[in-house]
Regions:
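Carbohydrate transferase catalytic cores enriched for Leloir-type hexosyltransferases
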Residues: 1-250
Length: 250
């Protein structure tokens, strides 16, 4: 909610002809600046699909801004067919007003990391020799508990490395780990420099992403570019990101 008047004045002053809102929103009343066309990129409608994960205030604000942007934009870019379907379903936007453009990931992941560099990274973060990897904020929606529970049925030498910003959800994981005696087989990392992530990906045996809902799923692309197998969840957009060469579970 930046100064609406200030943005409108800037658009006119700089002779802007196209405004692109990069993440679910546009400046309010931009539709009144008739000489400026607008495009908005919508990443997801998680605040509607999984409303219980958001406070009432956040839901109202996110929904107001996104609904306004979708209604008044001259065109909408959705990052997946899943997001496009949600925009049509929740906001009644005509399908021909929406284009799907998939996201990409850094080219770093397609470059093979040398053996010495991988060893250095594994030693630096005290990573186990064999591990399953998952990357993403450690929150309920990402469903990391499903992976932790699966460890009980996997060989003891296979560990789980979870890279992501922790939230209160991490306490649920640790509680289950303690009860199941899995504390030594689960490793939490966060704040990892982007230069080290390719080595962490390429040293993993597989990448698992059981998220309940995503707008797209860039970590899946990072894993595929890293050359490791991917297991992901169904029922959102992950099959679009992973394609036919990944495995899916429900």
């Amino acid at each position: 909610f930046r100064s609406v008047g200030g943005i409108r004045r800037t658009l006119k002053r700089d002779n802007i002809r196209l405004f692109h809102g990069l993440s679910n929103e546009l400046p309010l009343t931009i539709h009144r600046v008739r000489e400026v066309k607008s495009v908005v990129t919508v990443h997801d409608l998680i605040f509607l699909r999984l409303s219980h994960c958001f406070s009432l205030v956040d839901r109202l604000i996110y929904n107001y801004k996104c609904r306004y942007a979708c209604k008044h934009a001259d065109h909408i870019i959705a990052v997946s067919e899943c997001t496009k379907r949600d925009i049509i379903h929740y906001y009644g936007i005509p399908a021909d007003k929406i284009s799907v453009i998939y996201q990409g990931c850094s080219s770093l992941y397609a470059c093979r990391v040398g053996k010495d560099k991988r060893k250095e990274v594994m030693r630096s973060y005290r990573l186990p020799e064999r591990y399953i990897l998952s990357v993403g904020t450690i929150e309920e929606r990402k469903n990391a508990l499903a992976i932790v529970k699966a460890l009980e049925y996997l060989p003891d030498e296979l560990h789980f490395v979870l890279v992501g910003r922790p939230t209160a959800y991490i306490h649920q994981l640790k509680e289950f780990m303690t009860k199941a005696g899995l504390q030594d087989r689960v490793h939490f990392l966060h704040g990892i420099p982007s230069d080290d992530l390719p080595a962490i990906y390429q040293s993993a045996e597989t990448f698992v992403y059981p998220s309940v809902y995503e707008g797209f799923g860039i970590p899946i692309l990072e894993a595929l570019h890293s050359g490791i197998p991917v297991v992901a969840a169904t029922d959102s957009c992950l099959e679009e990101a992973g394609g036919e060469h990944s495995l899916y579970v429900s």
